[in-house]
A protein has these predicted regions:
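Short, intrinsically disordered N-terminal pre-domain segments
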Residues: 1-17
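Short, surface-exposed, charged amphipathic helix/loop patches that serve as local interaction elements
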Residues: 24-170
Length: 170
């Protein structure tokens, strides 16, 4: 039997791991990002910020990639990005050894990925519980910056999971 894309009319409620109202181990965070909503651990007498997201259709995802620059992104940068080491210290030395052309291509590709993340979040973020106004603008005002970046990354991770995995990913 064929599998069909998940409906884009549902809304999923998520929280992000950097929320101070949560108390989760790295293993619980990983499980939560993979769709195990039972791993969400909230501190007693606390309430996290909830974000409501919707799945994206294949057409939505293609539109996002094109808007972010899919046809003009650096293919050399993509190849270098895929080849980078996992270990942070090793990656630092590896990056330092790249030629200027390779560093530039790598930076261009990372910029493209950042645009994809931003466009994905803008398109699929429906609302933030208890917040009136533009949800994307609210995310841009999260401080410190590390929490803003992590919030966007986790929101996009959830969006990709529910958009690509169908019903079993929700």
């Amino acid at each position: 039997m064929l599998k069909f894309s998940t409906t884009t009319t549902i809304e999923i409620k998520i929280a992000v791991s950097c929320d101070p109202a949560l108390d989760m181990t790295p293993a619980e965070i990983s499980a939560y990002l993979q769709g195990d909503f039972d791993s969400l651990k909230i501190k007693q007498d606390q309430a996290p910020t909830y974000f409501f997201i919707k799945p994206l259709s294949p057409a939505d995802r293609e539109e996002i990639e094109i808007k972010a620059g899919a046809y003009t992104r650096s293919e050399l940068g993509r190849m270098i990005y895929l080849d980078q080491p996992d270990d942070q210290k090793t990656r630092a030395y590896w990056h330092d050894a790249l030629s200027d052309q390779e560093k530039n291509a790598f930076a261009q590709y990372q910029s493209y990925l950042n645009r994809v993340y931003a466009e994905t979040a803008k398109k699929a973020l429906v609302r933030i519980e208890g917040f009136e106004g533009n949800a994307w603008d609210a995310i841009q005002s999260i401080k410190p910056d590390a929490h803003r970046i992590l919030t966007i990354a986790e929101i996009v991770t959830h969006i990709q999971r529910i958009s690509l995995l169908g019903d079993e990913g929700k």
